[in-house]
């Protein structure tokens, strides 16, 4: 009976997390990628101010994830989680009516909402005590992220063929409503001894931060400027320029699905491979001959996008206790928000000076530095790199 109850509980967590992940991440990606287009094309912002409007979203996400969420108990976090999902319905409506002034307020509120949602959803996906089940659920969560990032851009790609950017926000409201209903059933940790003491010094968190740096610096730039780069370089329409996201996230989904089916106990070789692909693709950006070649490069970048995030979250789950995990995930997401806040701003400025192609080449520098530092500090850490033996998928459930 206990085994049956455990299976029912596991299935319940899988369903609620996957549905919540789709609602949250599909709309989050839409807001992050469409707001710059609305600012640039409808409101005539410069590249620099396009970078700033994107920074506003991540600034408010950072404030919540880094300073507020780690200090809240699980009961209050759950109430705010539900409230944030409800608030997003009104945020999408406000984007539809936004002008050059109100778009800043809409972006700030969106950042606050996602700041409470993202770290708590990651924590909910890592509650299980059994390591194999926990890492399988983390992989399923990552698969849900990628699936939402395929269906979301696919829907937006179709919508942009029939409506302008403002109406896209309206069409995503039903997905947010589903997320609001699902948020009522998401499980939160019930431990009474949650702590954030010394979490910033935790090796699992620090290794995860270095790992995510190897990819999220270029991805922070791509998530904001990919469509604008495609329009500028290849002179394609807005809907066509948006289409590389679909191929990109499809490869990411395939990568995460394979990691779910055949998880590795050691992540050394997959991590090295992912960092190498990122560096290779960035070095080829100045030499892209046509739009088809651009799509191929984006598909290659989908591999590290699929692998780096789940590897980072697995590092946190291996290196922290349940009592530390909310704070660790909050600080981890806060760090990501810093990257997505600073990189677009700097990248937007650099683009205005040296152009898109050379700007992407500059992104190689932090990728290489963070990768080298990661393996120098943690390359022999057996908690993260115990060997290359695979964990049997059949025994993970």
Tell where the protein language model's regions lie, with residue ranges.
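Helix-to-loop junctions at the C-terminal end of transmembrane segments
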Residues: 64-76, 255-267, 351
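A late C-terminal transmembrane helix in Major Facilitator Superfamily
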Residues: 324-354
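Structural signature of the two symmetry-related core transmembrane helices
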Residues: 79-93, 269-283
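Interfacial helix-cap and linker-helix signal at transmembrane-aqueous boundaries
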Residues: 39-40, 71-73, 155-163, 230-231, ...
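Cytoplasmic helix-loop-helix junction between adjacent transmembrane helices
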Residues: 108-143
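Loop-to-transmembrane helix entry/capping segments in MFS-fold secondary transporters
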Residues: 47-48, 131-141, 238, 322-332
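Helix-loop boundary and gating motifs at the non-cytosolic
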Residues: 8-53, 58, 216-233
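C-terminal membrane-cytosol helix-exit motif in multi-pass small-molecule transporters
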Residues: 173-191, 373-378
